[in-house]
Amino acid sequence: MAPQQNIMKQLQQMQSSPYPSSSPSSTTVSQNNDNLNHNVHSLNNSSNNNNNNNNNNNNNNNNNNNNNNNNNNNNNNNNNNNNSINEKNKINDNNNRGNSDDGNNNNSNNNSNNNNSNNNNRDDEEEEGDDEDNNNNNNSNNNKIRGYNDNNDINDIFSINFSSWSKSKDNLIENGVLIFEESGLYKELNLSKSSILNFLSIVASSYRNNPFHSFNHAIAVTQTIFLILLKTNLFNILSPIEKLSIIIASICHDLDHPALSNRFQINMKSSIAVLYNNKSVLENHHLSICLGILESKIGNELLSTLTVEEKKQFFRRVKILILATDMENHFTYKKQFDDIISTFSWDNSEHRDLLLIMFLKSADISNELRSFDISNKWANALMEEFFNQSDLEKLNNLPLTPFMEREKVVLHLTQVSFIEKFLLPSYQSLQNLLPSLEDFVQRIIENKEIWSNNGSSSSTTSSSPN
């Protein structure tokens, strides 16, 4: 069996049903103060919190209405200020770009030549004039990513130096709304801005205020996905359902993260470790929370315009994408992707799925794409989580995780090692298929060199963010 078939078969075994199963009953992981003093919320508890936040969502809707005009003005400013990036496309022009398993049968080479929007014969197709306007907006943004020295403002989703550190939760939600809008999904799937706002608000409330694994991280990862799709011109190639799937998965991939790793959950014999048989414990937990939100009233409103088949494909992709963020399986996915590069076909749905997986996995560890000062902040945040876990491991007489021990970690060396082992090879593989990502690879190399010559205590840690 071909390597890509192996991995897709493995992924598809997670659930044969086209729709998500009901959420597991009470997955509360409750340790007392002598053990962890840290709870991993159950899906039921998360649902209760979601209900409590509905009133807040209504307030956010009102605030969003006031901000819409500002968003539009900022979008125009983004378009005017963006620096054009030359797109180099290694993929042969005679490759058919597109039949995915979403029933999108009309994608072809005309997608890149004519920059047609990817509406794919939806029943409620937009009027021709609106479609042309949407295409023009997409084209004005494609391959226009702000330079490395730009200031970050509240709506600067086009900047490689996007930073969520100084942003409030409302600002981050606004960034998320803009990413949906600039991705073309409003018109392609007839999504309403209010449903997206409500969804993002409930997602934001389902993240904990961790040093690293927080809503800030989720939006940073999602913005990286946005930049990748923009820079590679894949907004004009991927189907609307593929785009929706990876954006939703990016935003939700660390929901209710306890800032304690899979290894810790397993060694502690936590409730979620038992529930998921010690396999991708946190990733399954994040997925459960995500599916609970998507199955709620707010989720149903968000997906109300999708057909039955589109929902089936959407849920399938969200599942495989979130589960793929388990770094224990990193090299397996990397090898599977490398094996298909030379024969990659846009007509092969498994190839497309694996490409999306590599996008999300790479974006999840992409702090080194930012300027050094921004990535340095992420470094310290992740180290804070790691050191806290190490303290708890000692307190509970658990096996110590080597790269988390305060006394042994040399941060700049740890960072260089991670870049060389995980981050850089991932982006180099993506560049082999999509040459326009060369700038991203060069930025990673530049930051690696800074770490190589830096013995300070500051470092951008990228060790397994699970």
Curated annotation (Swiss-Prot):
Residues 1-150 are annotated as: Disordered. The keyword Hydrolase applies. The gene is pde3. Disruption phenotype: Shows a moderate phenotype with increased basal cGMP levels, but only a small effect on cAMP-stimulated cGMP levels. This is cGMP-specific 3',5'-cGMP phosphodiesterase 3. The active site is at residue 213. Gene3D superfamilies: 3'5'-cyclic nucleotide phosphodiesterase, catalytic domain. Residues 1-120, 135-150 have a biased composition (Low complexity). Binds 2 divalent metal cations per subunit. Site 1 may preferentially bind zinc ions, while site 2 has a preference for magnesium and/or manganese ions. Keywords: cGMP, cGMP-binding, Cytoplasm, Hydrolase, Manganese, Metal-binding, Nucleotide-binding. One of its GO terms (biological process) is cAMP-mediated signaling. Residues 123-134 have a biased composition (Acidic residues). It is an enzyme of class 3 (hydrolase). Its cofactor is a divalent metal cation. Inhibited by 3-isobutyl-1-methylxanthine (IBMX). A divalent metal cation 2 binds at residue 254. It comes from Dictyostelium discoideum. Its EC number is 3.1.4.35.
